[in-house]
């Protein structure tokens, strides 16, 4: 029902086609076996994948993800990042991700915009991040030891 909602609201397809599309989207996020479960019966990571399936149900040109990894363990966060990246590439969707997870930014970001106190402070590619001179950006992005190590290796 969750994935069917946008199809029921905004699609003129037959019920059979809407069900087929919903099942396709659930299968795409590896949740076809959970299609009969209620939200309270699935994990946080599965709930995030349902949200992605619902978001792609209408074949959008744009996908907006607000903190897609919040509340998830590192392994599940990586699964969500890979899923967002794969779907973005596979369906040629422009995806905007709002996140504080710098590992995610550096893992799936192509173009990065750093916003500080509501203003765009820096913009560039993830490769350009390694050479950025903006101190606030560097302090924020490279706060984790893992990313500090990656930066050193890219010098």
Residue ranges of predicted features:
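Conserved ABC ATPase signature
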Residues: 38-42, 46
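A short, proline-enriched helix->beta-strand linker immediately N-terminal to the Walker B motif
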Residues: 57-61
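Catalytic Walker B motif of ABC-type/P-loop ATPase nucleotide-binding domains
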Residues: 63-66
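Helix N-cap at the start of a conserved alpha-helix in ABC-type nucleotide-binding domains
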Residues: 74-76
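H-loop/switch region of ABC-family ATPase nucleotide-binding domains
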Residues: 99-100
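C-terminal boundary and immediately downstream tail of ABC-type ATPase nucleotide-binding domains
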Residues: 130-155
